[in-house]
């Protein structure tokens, strides 16, 4: 476009420069006014010094400085083959270059040497488009040779996000120890720790004598606390190769204490192991299952909520309708225990246990409880599940407790609670299981804290006027146990160390039969029933979040439907390996 000014018109011919370049290329092809030939092997291409000097700093320095090439008729370019030289000259005179699988590497190397940054980046972009799990490790090495940060970043991203496929490639076995350490130790590695361990052992055994000395340092990159204890027990703890290393033996013993000891871990190394964060690829998902939906009968629905997308997703339905079952998460699986199995015309108190795998999106039967029960409470600690109280087959209030060992797949009876209660708030903190409040068989509130010492299998109780919750969940939030509502708007935070309660910001409504869980250090409360100002009871679809940092509540919108007496859980997994978006 022409530009007018006070003293005239500025004319711009936008085709002039491209036409000029086209004419110069025509002169080159006709060998008119050419004054230098650049050579690769026996291949000689006549060119114009001024065009070459204008095209890159490399040629400008060659022809405009005191180098001998300034006056030579022929200039030999070492390290460049004839086809690549043709591509470079074509690019200089036309601004175009054909990049393909068979020439991208020599063209990229030549572009780097001759200082053509845009051509170099074009080659990098082409290689990035060809990245796959099978070649990304090789591309990382290539990018380091070529000093190409954009390619290196993209190739590493593929290597991290496609770890299971990369681990199966031959290139992994060819990494040096330092490269493997940086790879396996990266927070962004998208893979389960079991696969990380397996990849490490494959690498070591590929050249055992030369690589055995790196085993201790590399074994530290496996985040053992996120490995399924059964896998650790069967495949890691007694591995002969690891046991041959005294340093690895210490790591193994530390991990064993952390995973399997019911006593508190006070060893400094064990504390360090305990506090290594999960990899960034792990995400927390909120799970809602069972309960009563839209004032109707008990539902089999299972819903997953992603905080990242704000979307709800339906999962495989519960195998049967269960009224007032309990549910927990353990080792990235969901366990649903007991409940009253509701079918057409019949209702039976169940001792069944159903286990859900998010990766398979499937339910399976687990080892049944010793006693059939519903309206009970369950909680998990380390490798154990505790199932507490409830109502038995004879509709009697039970004070019994049983414990499931997920490694040995067995249930055993434990000490009964001092006072049998229904619908208490339950949480585990610092090797102790806490039962807050609840109600007796006559539906009178029980103002007690009942505490179970896990390693001693013993109970004690404390009376308190602070407790009056019924049908309220409890969660561990930081160093405190938070009791959420229970026929009240009140939120109480209990500090086990000081045995004191702190009142937090109230909920909007008086709520009961709701669910609560923790994701990312925040409390999420779902559904339930609420008491209106005129003392009517309404089912709720509310979805609220409490931030302990600011002591404030915010609405997260609505659940897909009204729901109460449901389970509300947090399940941690890697979306890519679990079929999630």
Swiss-Prot record:
Presence of the UniProt keyword Repeat in the record: yes
SMART domains for this protein: BACK (SM00875), BTB (SM00225), Kelch (SM00612)
Recorded GO CC terms: Cul3-RING ubiquitin ligase complex; cytoplasm
Superkingdom: Eukaryota
PROSITE patterns reported for this sequence: BTB
Record bears the keyword Repeat: yes
Record CDD domains: BACK_KLHL38 (cd18476), BTB_POZ_KLHL38 (cd18268)
Protein's name according to its UniProt entry: Kelch-like protein 38
Organism whose genome encodes this protein: Homo sapiens (Human)
């Amino acid at each position: 476009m022409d530009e007018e000014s006070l003293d005239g018109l500025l004319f711009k011919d936008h085709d002039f420069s491209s036409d000029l370049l086209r004419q110069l290329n025509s002169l080159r092809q006709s060998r008119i006014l050419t004054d230098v030939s650049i050579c690769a092997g026996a291949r000689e291409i006549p060119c114009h010094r001024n065009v070459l000097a204008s095209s890159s700093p490399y040629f400008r320095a060659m022809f405009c400085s005191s180098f001998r090439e300034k006056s030579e008729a022929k200039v030999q370019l070492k390290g460049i083959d004839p086809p690549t030289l043709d591509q470079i000259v074509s690019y200089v005179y036309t601004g175009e270059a054909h990049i393909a699988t068979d020439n991208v590497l020599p063209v990229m190397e030549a572009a780097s040497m001759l200082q053509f940054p845009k051509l170099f980046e074009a080659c990098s972009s082409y290689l990035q488009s060809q990245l796959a799990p099978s070649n990304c490790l090789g591309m990382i090495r290539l990018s380091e040779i070529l000093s190409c940060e954009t390619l290196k970043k993209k190739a590493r991203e593929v290597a991290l996000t496609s770890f299971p496929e990369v681990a199966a490639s031959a290139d992994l076995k060819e990494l040096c120890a330092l490269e493997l350490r940086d790879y396996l130790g990266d927070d962004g590695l998208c893979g389960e720790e079991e696969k990380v361990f397996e990849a490490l052992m494959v690498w070591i055994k590929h050249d055992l004598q030369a690589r055995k000395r790196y085993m201790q340092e590399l074994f530290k990159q496996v985040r053992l606390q996120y490995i399924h204890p059964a896998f650790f027990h069967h495949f890691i703890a007694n591995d002969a190769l690891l046991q041959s290393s005294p340093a690895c033996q210490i790591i193994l013993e530390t991990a064993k204490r952390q995973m399997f000891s019911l006593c508190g871990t006070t060893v400094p190394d064990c504390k360090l192991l305990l506090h290594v964060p999960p990899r960034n690829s792990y995400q927390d998902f909120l799970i809602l299952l069972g309960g009563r939906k839209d004032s109707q009968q008990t539902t089999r629905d299972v819903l997953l909520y992603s905080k990242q997308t704000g979307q709800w997703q339906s999962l495989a339905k519960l195998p049967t309708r269960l009224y007032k079952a309990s549910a927990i998460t353990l080792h990235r699986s969901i366990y649903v225990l007991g409940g009253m199995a509701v079918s057409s015309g019949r209702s039976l108190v169940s001792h069944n246990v159903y286990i859900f795998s998010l990766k398979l999106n499937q339910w399976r039967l687990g080892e049944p409880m010793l006693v059939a029960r519903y309206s009970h409470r369950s909680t998990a600690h380390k490798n154990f599940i505790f199932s507490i109280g409830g109502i038995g087959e004879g509709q009697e209030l039970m004070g019994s407790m049983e414990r499931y060992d997920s490694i040995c797949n067995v249930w055993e009876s434990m000490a009964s609670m001092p006072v049998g209660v229904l619908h208490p708030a339950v949480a585990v903190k610092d090797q102790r299981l806490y039962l807050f409040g609840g109600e007796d068989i006559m539906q009178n509130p029980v103002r007690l804290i009942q505490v179970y010492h896990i390693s001693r299998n013993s109970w004690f109780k404390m009376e308190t006027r602070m407790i009056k919750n019924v049908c309220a969940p409890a969660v561990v939030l930081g160093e405190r146990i938070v009791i959420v509502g229970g026929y009240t708007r009140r939120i109480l935070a209990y500090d086990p160390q000081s045995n004191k309660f702190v009142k937090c910001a109230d909920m909007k409504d008086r709520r009961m039969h709701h669910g609560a869980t923790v994701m990312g250090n925040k409390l999420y409360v779902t559904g339930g029933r609420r008491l209106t100002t005129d003392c009517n009871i309404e089912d709720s679809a509310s979805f609220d979040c409490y931030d302990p940092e600011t002591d404030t509540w915010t609405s997260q919108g609505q659940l897909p439907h009204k729901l109460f007496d449901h389970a509300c859980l947090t399940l941690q997994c890697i979306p890519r390996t679990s079929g999630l978006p």
